[in-house]
Amino acid sequence: MAMQSLSPVPKLLSTTPSSVLSSDKNFFFVDFVGLYCKSKRTRRRLRGDSSSSSRSSSSLSRLSSVRAVIDLERVHGVSEKDLSSPSALRPQVANLEDILSERGACGVGFIANLDNIPSHGVVKDALIALGCMEHRGGCGADNDSGDGSGLMSSIPWDFFNVWAKEQSLAPFDKLHTGVGMIFLPQDDTFMQEAKQVIENIFEKEGLQVLGWREVPVNVPIVGKNARETMPNIQQVFVKIAKEDSTDDIERELYICRKLIERAVATESWGTELYFCSLSNQTIVYKGMLRSEALGLFYLDLQNELYESPFAIYHRRYSTNTSPRWPLAQPMRFLGHNGEINTIQGNLNWMQSREASLKAAVWNGRENEIRPFGNPRGSDSANLDSAAEIMIRSGRTPEEALMILVPEAYKNHPTLSVKYPEVVDFYDYYKGQMEAWDGPALLLFSDGKTVGACLDRNGLRPARYWRTSDNFVYVASEVGVVPVDEAKVTMKGRLGPGMMIAVDLVNGQVYENTEVKKRISSFNPYGKWIKENSRFLKPVNFKSSTVMENEEILRSQQAFGYSSEDVQMVIESMASQGKEPTFCMGDDIPLAGLSQRPHMLYDYFKQRFAQVTNPAIDPLREGLVMSLEVNIGKRGNILELGPENASQVILSNPVLNEGALEELMKDQYLKPKVLSTYFDIRKGVEGSLQKALYYLCEAADDAVRSGSQLLVLSDRSDRLEPTRPSIPIMLAVGAVHQHLIQNGLRMSASIVADTAQCFSTHHFACLVGYGASAVCPYLALETCRQWRLSNKTVAFMRNGKIPTVTIEQAQKNYTKAVNAGLLKILSKMGISLLSSYCGAQIFEIYGLGQDVVDLAFTGSVSKISGLTFDELARETLSFWVKAFSEDTTKRLENFGFIQFRPGGEYHSNNPEMSKLLHKAVREKSETAYAVYQQHLSNRPVNVLRDLLEFKSDRAPIPVGKVEPAVAIVQRFCTGGMSLGAISRETHEAIAIAMNRIGGKSNSGEGGEDPIRWKPLTDVVDGYSPTLPHLKGLQNGDIATSAIKQVASGRFGVTPTFLVNADQLEIKVAQGAKPGEGGQLPGKKVSAYIARLRSSKPGVPLISPPPHHDIYSIEDLAQLIFDLHQINPNAKVSVKLVAEAGIGTVASGVAKGNADIIQISGHDGGTGASPISSIKHAGGPWELGLTETHQTLIANGLRERVILRVDGGLKSGVDVLMAAAMGADEYGFGSLAMIATGCVMARICHTNNCPVGVASQREELRARFPGVPGDLVNYFLYVAEEVRGILAQLGYNSLDDIIGRTELLRPRDISLVKTQHLDLSYLLSSVGTPSLSSTEIRKQEVHTNGPVLDDDILADPLVIDAIENEKVVEKTVKICNVDRAACGRVAGVIAKKYGDTGFAGQVNLTFLGSAGQSFGCFLIPGMNIRLIGESNDYVGKGMAGGEIVVTPVEKIGFVPEEATIVGNTCLYGATGGQIFARGKAGERFAVRNSLAEAVVEGTGDHCCEYMTGGCVVVLGKVGRNVAAGMTGGLAYLLDEDDTLLPKINREIVKIQRVTAPAGELQLKSLIEAHVEKTGSSKGATILNEWEKYLPLFWQLVPPSEEDTPEASAAYVRTSTGEVTFQSA
């Protein structure tokens, strides 16, 4: 068995350079980790040292890890400062919208010496670790400018004293000297002005400037783009003689920095001045640099005298391709990996509390250090600022972060029982500070403490280890630093909400509970809460109606209700207790385009998480979420006291009338009711704006008079025709913003008492714009009226609807609203309503800027729209109906949800469907022309309807335009899963697309291999291979060219992946972005179950997020994985249009995607909550335009194909999309209609009348479609495209793609407003350097040389694969070797399929494996890892075996150590894994058929599992078996703590009593011991009778009757297991 060293990293890590920056030769050794972002220019600057490795030349060329030696003097001629001919700094425009678009993620870590002994080794190791995280960072369009990297350390005083001596300065007094690391303006004149301002303020504050130092940098190592914006980098040394306390000195330096920032804010160069650090304790070196370039750029870091006892390092991946130098990290306190989802609300609230933030330590100087946030900064920078003010005010870093980023302390049995004081701490601060919510691994230091904490959901990886020589390490990945395993005494990971802190002063390490218990003991928080907080107890619902029926009807009409709202929303929620589900998409006009009046809420679309942060599952992970609300004044967060706890606590924001009355009785709140009616007797013009002014003034007066509760109410004893109500959302937003601007917002809460709120979207809007709670009195009255109606009573009596009492109906409604709110929060990845409140996470379509600025400040509104007067008139259009003489006795049906004649226009209407069916079935050009005419005559429905084509060319003959057969190759169909639609529909669409050379999409759920070969047995249109289809031809092939990888990973096997032309990662879906899905058991037929590796009738849940995509670098990793197994398939990423999508798309392009698909909100779906269909996602016109233009501006457009979908129906739509930048065009609903869909809109019921969206065989038999119908449709569309191109004078689509100058606004009048602004759609930033055809024909993006290439280069391995032999091989591996074995598995799968390989490839790996180790493993592959692994082990494996064991000589107990990372076995469809140690979060998530044994796990073990078997021989985290609908789990419970950790919604918990179950458990443990040498497993087997009763078996309903789970099965005398009848 040959030993081959495939990675030089272990050798490099043990190498110590003999001289660093010595006088004769300046060699600097780094671990150069290359990825796709490595430029040829950089590689030319590096020369490999072949003597350091025994690797072959082919191995040396591998870029995943290359040892490099850089001769700095000879190659670069380094001088102290090289800023020759710097280009002018490009201005960075930033505002609140910028902050929402400046997203990113990273790789981070720290090294700390417990003895607090400074050394250069710490710095060097930190740089090596940083180099090993290059793959977690991003590069700019030049492939050379890093998105950012940096290092924080203690101040290297000995190093600086050498410089001081050279400058004839006295040695620095460590205690009284501060050091500033400063980015200064590029321009020399401005730089001198900046330095003068700095010196003047230091002098004014009594500080003495000791000297300025130009930081020596190596300019040529900087990428081209980064060099253009590179600042002057200098250090300033100042003496602080008036203070002796370190804390006072740091505070004085903080004041100086804030004064400097304020002083330069109005200067033209003000944004170019930035303090990386100004401290007596720490210093930060950072910049727009790649990982390996940091130490090469900053020559200081190479000097042996640069010593520190700790170092925090950070590598940034920004979605913004033009990141700024100041946004590199670490910040001044924090290094952040993740994204704060609530940043806009956090900034608003920080601004609000500025007036109240006071602390004695500031001696009255608080005004001088404001503001505490900066909208021009990133979320990380603002979180750092919030932590900084708290720390400088006297909090410890640990305490500050517990306040800012609290853990999910509710539903936490360990905390509540063992550490109640920690719960009290969190409860106290919950009312004072909203959580900064979102994925976050935060590393922190103030120079005395260094530590790390993780967000409440545990969404970023964090591993830590401690050694016997007193070093502590934390990192995003293991294997980044050279450590002797024999010295490692502790290995672990940070779980959700956990923290670790190293006290450098006292040499102590504090793990999670130790830290929190210590911090929580500082004050008697529990006592303060008990004595001051009031809990609003549940108040009974009213048992009868308050209003007469006529009065209810009038109120409903006045406030904008329709019969659909009452029947399909309110009554449905009252009856079912959940939000109603609907299907298809939102095909009515946007509210601003509609000819009908809309409620104000309809102009707002909910924003959602995609790529840069994940959505949350509110149903299965509700333990981390909370709707709790605190009412009352929020105190001064900087000074503690019992009075801050004086608030009223609500369990949720939905108040019934009685609860509101109780709240109004609270004497401490001093509630004030403010009426929201306005007077139109003097005319409509100006009336609404004037009323808002008076309302805000009244709110202002009330708060200044001591009111802590403002109730904005539209309740009235009698409605009056001339006194309509201000839309309650407008009132709430205006008051909220007014109080913020006047420094009063923290003094009072806002409650809406309103008739104009009934849907979950309405509640979300009110809370999102500032309301803490809502009393929906008219909706509750409507529930009561419904329950008391004769019709409802009769339905209940007949069993048509559930029987509920009047109180239960209102309770159901409230329950549904709360559940809907949780879902809306979770779409954005937000866990707490308190963080959502005021966060304004919406996008506005159709409101004017004056309205937005007053009430919805900072919200994105790109197309402007209604003015205040126009909004007033729209409000009145509802109001007058209530007082009209011809008012009907029933509510009007507006037709907003379902199509109805005379109602709102639906683009997918019956007439359109009939016309299309006639055209494609009769193959009639005339009929298609009628269909075209129908579309052209429709009302304005979408933004593109406001545009038309223009041209500067003369028309040309159609014959000169590219042929239809070329155009149709740009067409694709939507990702509709086999399960949501029938087999007949799915296959007919695929065959049609293959006939024309287009691409169909498999959707989620896999694909039958029978479809991958052309048909050869067709007779008279029928084939025995596909007997359920007609209209077939020999040569037809039913494979989907695009194979989808969705969050459930159903049907995703190695063979499925290698048989794809393209692989689509569905991040979001237009009709329900931010949500997952569930295929009901009734739709899971035997055929569907087989494809999805499940059982018939078992519900199959797709999680809201991909559990291997929590950030942008995670997406890059999945793209890498897919390119690994199928290097010939282009990888597409499907996004949904929303503001900021351009920067997200930039990150996706930098992540090596080949295709980016932009979906509009009007796309279809098989099933979704109505609120999601109607109120989430944006128009693709805006999303596509932003994406195309952002990619061009950042030099990335040539890298990716842009595809668009959502409501496309015609050639006009195709050409509009082309002019806005799309290369390819997707059709979903129209493809289904062309194949037979009649738009019955009952897809979610499984009752489709024509079998298009049903799994019922009798309905599927009615399927009318043939592939030829869809072929005809697309050919007609292509011919339409040709005709218009000819009229415009262009020869091909290539000629017009991205040419927005060919569009102009139509001369058209809208009913509501003439103030829409389409300039954004018509703007242009140029076109790509390559044509669309050239972009589409580019080769698949490559991963570059990888470890698997070296394995496959071994002739013995290839021989074993080709001839099904056995081969064994040992390979070294390190963390940069990612997706190891994925490509080998792909080669085998392509040749043999998922189960056909009879040989064996046995690989042993030595070291720390990178992410996705053993991904997509295939039967016959057996891999053993001696070492440890990072996240995603066994992802998508279909067979084979993975064994992970620690090295032989270790200093820790294996079963107590973490050996594999998070999200292992994700989507596995077979195989086994045995790990001697613990796993991280979400072990076996969505496991289908794999078996596993592990010795402990984090939270969410076995989540969404549908099959297989998992054995855990140690402790598990919370929420085990959430969403687990199949498979079995055996969990050892040695200390009787397991049961509270089980999610019991689905699974049954029982002891192991079935003989087959015992046999299964024991056999797996025996295999585990044999393969890993597990001492824990051996002990269990040796004492089996003792341990067996300690195991719990988790059994979902689908497994209850299996031999392993049912005691009804017994073992016979022959050893067989048989069923024992009663």
UniProtKB/Swiss-Prot annotation:
Q: Which residues form the active site?
A: C106 (for gatase activity)
Q: Name one Pfam family in it.
A: GATase_2
Transit peptide stretch: 1-105
Required co-factor? Answer: [3Fe-4S] cluster; FAD; FMN
**UniProt note on tissues of expression:** Highly expressed in leaves. High expression in the leaf mesophyll and phloem companion cell-sieve element complex.
Q: Tell me the route in metabolism or biology where this protein functions.
A: Amino-acid biosynthesis; L-glutamate biosynthesis via GLT pathway; L-glutamate from 2-oxoglutarate and L-glutamine (ferredoxin route): step 1/1; Energy metabolism; nitrogen metabolism
Q: Where does [3Fe-4S] cluster bind?
A: C1237, C1243, C1248
Outcome recorded upon mutating L1270F: In glu1-201; Abolishes interaction with SHM1. Displays photorespiratory chlorosis when grown at ambient CO2
Copy out the cofactor comment: Binds 1 [3Fe-4S] cluster.
The EC number of this protein is: 1.4.7.1
Induction of synthesis: Up-regulated by GATA21/GNC and GATA22/CGA1. Induced by light or sucrose.
Record: residues binding FMN: 1184-1241
Cellular component terms per the entry's GO annotation:
apoplast; chloroplast; chloroplast envelope; chloroplast stroma; mitochondrial matrix; mitochondrion; plasma membrane
Q: What is its main location?
A: plastid
Q: Where does the UniProt annotation locate this protein?
A: Plastid, Chloroplast stroma; Mitochondrion matrix
Q: What happens when the gene is disrupted?
A: Displays photorespiratory chlorosis when grown at ambient CO2.
Q: Which reaction does it catalyse?
A: 2 oxidized [2Fe-2S]-[ferredoxin] + 2 L-glutamate = L-glutamine + 2 reduced [2Fe-2S]-[ferredoxin] + 2-oxoglutarate + 2 H(+)
For this chain's UniProt record, which GO biological process terms are given? L-glutamate biosynthetic process; photorespiration; response to light stimulus; response to sucrose
The UniProt entry, under CDD domains, shows: gltB_C, GltS, GltS_FMN
List each copy of the Glutamine amidotransferase type-2 domain by range: 106-505
Coiled coil spans: none
Provide the assembly information.
Interacts with SHM1.
- What family is reported? Belongs to the glutamate synthase family.
Function text:
Involved in glutamate biosynthesis in leaf. Required for the reassimilation of ammonium ions generated during photorespiration.
Q: What is this protein called?
A: Ferredoxin-dependent glutamate synthase 1, chloroplastic/mitochondrial
Name its species: Arabidopsis thaliana
Give the gene that encodes this protein.
Answer: GLU1
